[in-house]
């Protein structure tokens, strides 16, 4: 036997099988022993008769010697005396009693196996008269000790020969073999290390481990109770005993090595000199039928009666090493309260964790240990029935991400049709769909969703569960699976693995053993023979060498293995490599002549175009090209030049599936020396834009202030519309190839990632996020993703993104004193103008395709995939906005593009004419006698009108410069028209002409304040007056009266919208109310602080006091205006729809003249 063998625990099935064999062997041995006993009994009877005969002869001799002088008697008297002598000598005992006495003596003598010398051993211990009897002095009295004084002088001469017996310790019940032996004798018997029977002091191993045979893995101890044998993985050799009896132990006593080896152990068999520290300590009783061995024969054994059937061994010879082995067989099915066994832990002398090498397991997973944990788990709620390696089961690791499968049985592969390589590493949910693709967290379509949820919830709680549900084999064939999930620990007390047992209840209806009420079913998961389910894929005609496929799979694999990028390849390898790429490419590599004839097609033609290469070679491209695309395609081929790329997009007719968009990209090749020219192209199917009109209208339609982009499914820009220049001040070509997340802040990227994940699945998804323009300003945006090339619910190859810039009031800015709830008019998006498109929009709709017929690599109406989705044709036939891209349209896309450009140009001209007519009507209607004056100093002559606190040009040049310096915004501007500067306002960089966000962020402080002193002008006013009011939409002016005198501020109608002096007409009459009720519309609903509210109230009282003075000077102003009107031009018109403007009632000027505003306001304000 091999002394270095490290065995592993056997499965319960194997243990039961071995135990059954051992029992059969024991029965055979018992029969042999009975035969031997019968022979021995016969010999004993003969010896008994001889002994009686000898005693009779001796008695007769003594009698004859004492009766020499006595007269002889009759033969009858002699016969009577002989009979009495026989009776006195025990001749009256029956044969059964004699046999029982011999058996008892034999059991008592052999309770402690030991070698004997060569002298004759008499089977009867009552042969006291024999002088050669070595047991004549055997003491039958009760023992007074435990042989503590026994020394090495105990006679054990001779050699012990090895016995080849079975490694089974079969001990019977205590009442069977020791019925006639005193209990005191049994209690004081000398303990042997391998006899786990009764209380005994510890004893050290008297044998050295060197030279001893190791105990085999099937070594077990049978206590004849209710459990089977146990395997033990011995780490060190263990000598055994091999003397066999009916009800005695059976151990191997062969030390191996012959007489020399036995002689070397003879000196170690002395039982004396044992110290208490080396004696084994054993617990009161053994848990039924379990005893494990490791380290050596005499290792101390300790076992707790209340613990699991596992034994801990520790070798006394290894002082610095502690090894704990806890293994044991599972309890019988009737035992349900056995605790889960502790894991196997081993610490070698080096201190590190030992790693057991997997010699026999290819997967490296200890399945026997896992099944043992299943059988010996704590408080089992499900009865599995019989389990062996023929079951279909998998093992999942719950500590890894998504609980992947780490082990799969052979019958599970046969049951599902999937191979081991297709199963390991995946979650078990792949069986819940016919195609094997099921995403986590999604609603199940082919399986009962509630059953799956219950299964998931129970597994998350770490509980056992039995669930029947529909699963699908490879290829989509369903079967009714009865699934049982059992959690088991491993190295710690926590749950590590889940073992799932499966069985097809339709094919194996007899597997259900029984069911207790409405509880779980007891199932026999074992299979006698299960046929392998083999999935047969749809038959497809394989490419033959005639189609150009000359390299087989083995050749391609060899080339890939021999590929070395650093080394120098030979010409043969280069040619083979090029040939491999050509024949295995997904794209159709084709060669065309200048006239459009096919000269070569790669084998991918069969997959993409459904034609065999031989069917198209020699034919013209026009035979499979759409009739409307023949002219532009032929023109592109004839105009091809060397070193110039050729890119043609046209509709090609497939053999069975109709027309599809096809793009070919290549160049002209000129063969040197022969003058032959051809065009080498690489073509692939290209899905085009497909967007339903109803989907677009449900999400807000098309507006002006929005950006349309084509993005990949990962969020990378493939094409950007041209209006990104005016909205974000960025160039489209700089954005192409970058990610949309680069324009966002980190806070918005997480939500954006979740939204694009939904869009990747074919759903229309929207999210609100933030974008940054070129200056780094943060703008609020709202992006909606549409499936680019198919309907909703189908996985697209690219996405269409509609990004709308939101209103200024929703932007994130620094806090101000007054928070305006109402949205600023400048941030309201314009109403969409349906049917109006510009030239840039037309290029956007066509995906950036150039007018000459070619397209950009990132902006063409192409995607990153090689084939369109299953719904491409259906999406194009539906209510598609891109109706011009239908494959069945009778015109070419170049013609449609030219027509669209023409229509857009006509619409733009018509729009310009309408706007011009609107300006003329406003100018004719607004012709009045009002003359513009400065809102601060009231001057009417100035070289340029500048912007003031209201955002309008209501300040003269000097006052406007002071205001700009005070607020830190100096706008250098030259005027080409004296007195009127509004003509340059459209191209101005003034904060009022920029976006409201620019005006707000441009402020150095959270609020912009303006103070007015007692003087009628703003000269020298550099401090901030108390009572300042600030809004998110722009600065405001606060005025205060301090000291003596009065402050007079005469404002025109242009400044009445944002200054406090023009907050509204005085409340005259019973409907008067709080000052907040008379705020202009753009300040309605605002929250003013207490100081500002008090200042407004004081201002209204001041207005009522000065109303009388205003009425007196009103006539004088009118006369002066009439006189000046004859010498000056009409005041310039305000810019229509001024972005961010805050004119009267919070709106822009909207091409309304100053006189109209004055007419609505009825009167100016002066103090």
Swiss-Prot record:
Claim: Ribosomal protein is one of the keywords in the record? no
**S-4a-FMN cysteine found at:** 428
- InterPro entries attached here? PAC, PAS, PAS-like_dom_sf, PAS_fold_3, Znf_GATA, Znf_NHR/GATA
Enumerate the residue ranges forming zinc fingers (GATA-type): 934-959
Q: Name one GO molecular function term.
A: sequence-specific DNA binding
Residue ranges of domain PAS in the record: 381-452, 574-644, 693-763
Q: Where is the PAC domain?
A: 469-508, 650-691
Quick one: where's region Disordered?
1-91, 307-355, 849-872, 918-952, 966-1047, 1060-1167
Where does this polypeptide localize?
Answer: Nucleus
Q: According to the lineage, what is the superkingdom?
A: Eukaryota
Any idea what this protein is called?
White collar 1 protein
Q: Which organism is it from?
A: Neurospora crassa (strain ATCC 24698 / 74-OR23-1A / CBS 708.71 / DSM 1257 / FGSC 987)
Q: Lineage of this protein's species? A: Eukaryota, Fungi, Dikarya, Ascomycota, Pezizomycotina
Q: Which gene encodes it?
A: wc-1
